[in-house]
């Protein structure tokens, strides 16, 4: 049988142990300072979250492309773009051109598309450069707005009937004189290099390539089609993967 004083000491010891255990539990549960290096989940793109960091177009000297598991909704003339992927202002074998400011690079809000479209543009540009190392870069015009939708005259004096859901891109024909910029007349178009671009986009799986009726470019019927107001650029559309 314990002496009364011993009982007091035992009780005090148990109480001290409980206090220490409770403090340890509180220390474990108390949140530490936020980790500023981690972006909130809603700010990460699906591609970054699921499949690692953003991918480069081709090597470290070019801007990174943040593929975002984008989705084309609706149809090109009445649709929108979910999680649009932005084409860099420049990359291996291509530059961008703003048809409103008439200078390079194009403003970012004019060059958004689906992941597949951005990949196609980058791939065709690399192949174009490989085939013609001395040629000027492929000159890319409008894709879509960041969330797609109407791309009419209110966004500049050039209106697009399509370009609404990230499946369309304009590419300007190379010039015969080898100068940078957009050809002003069909006579200024380098037809040989332009035909090369058409062939590359067809080989890459383009669903439709619209070309100028006065530029005399050819391709598979039903894919390459002459269309008014396309004498200074070709218009490429890819299929909606669903």
What are these regions (language model features)?
Residues 2-84:
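N-terminal secretory targeting signals
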Residues 133-135, 164-168, 231:
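Extracytoplasmic
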Residues 69-85, 158-176:
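Substrate-binding cleft of extracellular glycoside hydrolase catalytic domains
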Residues 143-145, 174-176, 239-241:
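Solvent-exposed coil/turn segments that connect beta secondary-structure elements
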Residues 25-27, 179-242:
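Catalytic cores and adjacent binding grooves of peptidoglycan-active enzymes
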Residues 57, 62-69, 73, 118-159, ...:
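Extended, low-complexity, intrinsically disordered C-terminal regulatory tails
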Residues 71-141, 196, 200:
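Active-site acidic/histidine clusters and adjacent loop/turn architecture
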Residues 151, 160-189, 193:
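Mid-length scaffold segments of soluble, non-membrane domains
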